[in-house]
Swiss-Prot record:
The keyword Kinase does not apply. This is Centrosomal AT-AC splicing factor. One of its GO terms (cellular component) is centrosome. InterPro entries: CCDC84-like (IPR028015). The gene is Cenatac. Residues 1-169 are annotated as: Required for centrosome location. Residues 137-168 form a coiled coil. Component of the minor spliceosome that promotes splicing of a specific, rare minor intron subtype. Negative regulator of centrosome duplication. Constrains centriole number by modulating the degradation of the centrosome-duplication-associated protein SASS6 in an acetylation-dependent manner. SIRT1 deacetylates CENATAC in G1 phase, allowing for SASS6 accumulation on the centrosome and subsequent procentriole assembly. Acetylated. Acetylation oscillates throughout the cell cycle, and the acetylation state at Lys-31 is regulated by the deacetylase SIRT1 and the acetyltransferase NAT10. Deacetylated CENATAC is responsible for its centrosome targeting, and acetylated CENATAC promotes SASS6 degradation by enhancing the binding affinity of SASS6 for APC/C E3 ubiquitin-protein ligase complex/FZR1. One of its GO terms (biological process) is negative regulation of centrosome duplication. It comes from Mus musculus.
Amino acid sequence: MAPPQRCPLCRQTFFCGRGHVYSHKHQRQLKGALERLLPQVEAARRAVRAAQVERYVPEHDRCCWCPCCGCEVRKHLSHGNLTVLHGGLLEHLASPEHKKATNKFWWENKANAQMKEKFLISPQDYARFKKSMVKGLDSYEEKEDEVIKEMAAQIREVEQSRQEVVRSVLEPQAESDPEEGSSAPESWKATNGHVASSSQQVSHLALQPVAELDWMETGQQLTFIGHQDTPGIGNIHSGATPPWMIQEEEHSSGSLPIGPSYEEFLKEKEKQKLKKLPPDRVGANFDHSSNTSAGWLPSFGRVWNNGRRWQSRHQFKTEAATRSKQPRKGKS
C-alpha cells in the first residue's frame, strides 16, 4: 500500500500514490485553479507595453492567489501616493522563484504543457514594462502639473472677481463721504432742536391736571384680582404645609387598622378556592357556618352510624322481619 499523501488542490489525503493526479477530480480542480488566475495574468500582459499610473486608493492593496507558488501576491505596485497597476503581479511572474515553482507544479500535477508559458513573464517583457512604467510616471506628473495650473488659474479668477466686487462697493462710498461731512453739523442741529421741542411737550403735558374718570364717581365696588390670602387655607405657593405632610386625627390615633383583617383574609382565600370548583356541584349552597348535632346523619337505608357493621345488619333484618309480620296480623 502506498504511503498517504496530501493534495493541496483537492484538499484531501489519498492512498493511491501518483495515480491521484490522473483522476478526474484532480484534473477538474487543477483546471479551475488555473482558470481563476489566467484572466489576471492576461490583464497584466496588456499592461506591459502601456503601464498605467494612478493615485493610490485602498482598493490597490488587493492580492491574488498563485497556485504554482502556493502564496498570495499583490496585484499592484504602490509607493507613496502613486500606484502602478498590475506591477506587483508582473514582478512576481518574472521572478526566477516563480519560474522554478511553476515547472515543479506542472510536473507534479501533470498539467497541460502548452499553458505553462501563459503563466510566465520573460525578462525582456519585464524590461519593456519598466520602460513603459517610466513613461507612465512622466505623463502622470505632466497631467498633475496641468491640473495644478488649472486650479491656480481658477483661484486667481475668483480672487480677482472678489477684489472687483469689493472695489465697486467702496468707490461710491468714498465719493459720498465729503458731502456727508459738510451736511453733518446741520443735521446735528436739526436733531437737537427736535429733541428739545419734544421734551418741552412732555413737560407741558405733565403739568396739566389729570381728569377724574367716570367710574370713580359712580362708587361701584371693584373686585381685586391679585394675591388673596384666605384665612386658615393655604397652598404650597403661600408656604402652607402640603396635605401629605398633615397628620390627621383618625390616622394618628391608630384605631383604624390598615388593610383587611386576618379573618377577612381567610374568608377571601376560601372563596378563591371555591371559585375553582364547578358551581352545580352537590352541596355548593351548603352553609358550613351552621351548627349541627351529632345525629344529623339519616337513619334510613341502614346507614352505619355507630357500632360494628354486622350489628347494624342484624338490626336491619330484625326490623324488616317485624314489618313483614305486622300486615299478616292485620289480615288475620
